[in-house]
Amino acid sequence: INFGAIKAILKKWGKKLVEYALKHKDLYAPYIKKHLCEKL
């Protein structure tokens, strides 16, 4: 894995990804909750 490339992508798109994630959190929040509950 090229971490430099990942950092560059995150630097460029990080804000957009965060905005998108917040806008669509209802799509993945139940999945994350289920996943976390299974791990705990």
From Swiss-Prot:
Keywords: Disulfide bond, Membrane, Secreted, Target cell membrane, Target membrane, Toxin. Its main location: secreted. The keyword Transferase does not apply. It is found in: Secreted; Target cell membrane. It comes from the Eukaryota. Expressed by the venom gland. One of its GO terms (molecular function) is toxin activity. GO terms for cellular component: extracellular region; membrane; other organism cell membrane. Belongs to the ectatomin family. Ectatomin-Eq subfamily. Heterodimer of subunits A and B; disulfide-linked. This is U1-ectatotoxin-Eb1a subunit A. It comes from Ectatomma brunneum (Ant).
